[in-house]
Amino acid sequence: MIYTITFNPAVDLVIQVDQCQLGELNRSKGEAYVAGGKGINASLVLQRLGHVNYATGFVGGFTGQYIKDTLIQEGVKPLFVEVDGITRVNVKVKSQEETEINAAGPQVSPEKFAELLAIFERDLSSDDVVFLAGNAAPGLDVKAYIAIAKLCQERGAKFVLDTNKQLLTECLLYRPFVIKPNHHELGEIFGVSLKDEAEIIHYAKKLQELGARHIIVSRGGEGALLLTEDGQVFSSDIPKGRVVNSVGAGDSMLAGFVATYLETGDFAQSLKRGAATGSATAYSVWIAERQLIDDLVNQIHVVAH
């Protein structure tokens, strides 16, 4: 089974305006509510690619119910722990520029985290894959990530890690199956500015030395690099298209990669479909649909180094 964990999911309120002026009344030309969070995005992509999965984490109130309802409509199985308060609402104002206001989210108590951990202590096996995605919720810290990562290692489950620099580096010891920093984030980990492909590969290998098994480094318009555990290096380009929405593109890429690897065990094919999935989300209003992913796959070229 595949599980995704989003400690601090959100409902994203996307508002379209001609021009956003601070201190003035701004009228919306249109708005939309969507379920958000890295693990949520991964769950939706996995489901659309035919992989049944459980979405876990913490939700509360009517916004938490909205997220669960959205997932159920998509075929994802919600397995959240309910907390006091309401799941946060993040506001994204789109005009000539995009402005975001992200809420803090509800507090998660040690008792509530213990409830979530108990689910995995009861059910997790070596056949499972766990996406540990996003940042910590209020009340949680790196210990929560380490607890999940350590349990995955002990049970022999693959775990996929997509989070910030501190949380990522603290969990490398537990041998994540795959991580996906972009080239800026990779440079920040080591305090350097990466100028070319050779430098990216050099520092990605250092992350492997610290424990990561496979690493995807996304490079925006220049495509992506994949370094595998057995020393292979692949690069991909990206298909042509107009970027509509950058939110969730990286999560989609990672989900597309993992879904394809589980189906084929082929790294080149996995990178190719992962790149197509990330691009399909970037070229869509929300999370990518299967048809667009399939259309874009044939436009992508993967090269072994």
Descriptions of predicted regions:
Residues 1-56, 64-66:
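Glycine-rich phosphate/adenosyl-contacting loop at the front of the ribokinase-like
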Residues 2, 51-53, 78, 159, ...:
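Hydrophobic anchor at the start of a short beta-strand
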Residues 19-27, 181-183, 234-237:
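Short glycine/proline- and charge-enriched loop/turn segments
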Residues 46, 182, 250:
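Short, conserved phosphate/pyrophosphate- and ester-handling motifs at nucleotide-, phospho-/glycolipid
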Residues 47, 153, 262:
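Gly/Ala-rich phosphate-binding loop of Rossmann-like dinucleotide-binding domains
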Residues 48-128, 297-305:
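Conserved N-terminal subdomain of the carbohydrate kinase-like
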Residues 129-198:
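Conserved beta-alpha-beta core of the PfkB/ribokinase-like small-molecule kinase fold
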Residues 150, 169, 197-305:
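Conserved phosphate-binding/catalytic region of the ribokinase-like
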